[in-house]
Regions:
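Compositionally biased, non-globular sequence tracts
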Residues: 1, 38, 43, 172-174
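Polar/acidic, low-complexity leader/linker segments enriched in S/T/G and N/D
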Residues: 1-7, 12
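N-terminal, charged amphipathic alpha-helical interaction modules
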Residues: 12-95, 99-103
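Intrinsically disordered, low-complexity acidic/polar segments
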Residues: 68, 88, 113, 164-166
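Short intrinsically disordered coil segments
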Residues: 93-96, 119-122, 170-174
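Short, hydrophobic/π-rich interface segment
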Residues: 105-142, 146, 159-161
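Short Gly/Ser/Thr- and Asp/Glu-enriched loop/turn motifs at secondary-structure junctions
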Residues: 147-152
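C-terminal edge-of-domain segments
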Residues: 153-163, 168, 172
Length: 174
């Protein structure tokens, strides 16, 4: 990969969000409880940006994998309290969430974790080149970008060419 435009970035799958919004709950027994964002760093996983002060948001329990897996971790994530326009992939990392500090967890094509390439970025480094390097590793198909301290899921990244080559590919976070 030669540029950040070679990246396929995915927020929470809009179909999964539709179920959450229509049911009024996150599927883990938690009802949606809207509140006003403080604007003090609430990263929205629906549109991959930080919430602005006063925006109506909610906290849900979310697992990036929606299929049986020993790597299924449920954790708290912020989303808008009502459906938004979502994240429109640009081939680049989402601007407000494109730097460290972050934990980068690597997964193989079968969604098993590749421990050997998991990376902790402790400074405010640009994640693009680091993620590109990780996706260039033979066994790495997807990188999950997570917050540093609580390690909450932010978004997933795959190589655009790998996603385009697989015509049967669904969401990279299943």
């Amino acid at each position: 990969m030669s540029a950040n435009s070679d990246l396929f970035v995915q927020a929470i799958d809009p179909a999964r969000l539709d179920v959450i919004y229509s049911s009024g709950g996150d599927g883990h027994g938690n009802r949606l409880r809207p509140f006003a964002a403080t604007g003090q760093g609430e990263p929205l996983r629906c549109c991959l940006r930080y919430a602005e002060p006063g925006e109506q948001i909610t906290l849900i329990s979310y697992a990036p994998f929606d299929h049986p897996s020993v790597w299924t971790e449920v954790g708290p994530v912020y989303i808008h309290a009502a459906r938004c326009d979502g994240y429109r992939p640009t081939g680049r990392l989402p601007g407000q969430l494109a730097t460290g500090p972050r934990v980068l967890r690597t997964y193989r094509a079968d969604d098993t974790m590749d421990y050997g390439h998991n990376t902790v970025v402790t400074d405010d480094a640009d994640l693009g080149p680091i993620i590109q390097r990780l996706l260039g590793e033979r066994d790495v198909a997807t990188v999950h970008v997570r917050t540093l301290a609580p390690q909450c899921f932010l978004y997933a990244v795959a190589a655009r060419l790998a996603v385009e080559a697989d015509v049967e590919a669904g969401p990279i976070v299943r």
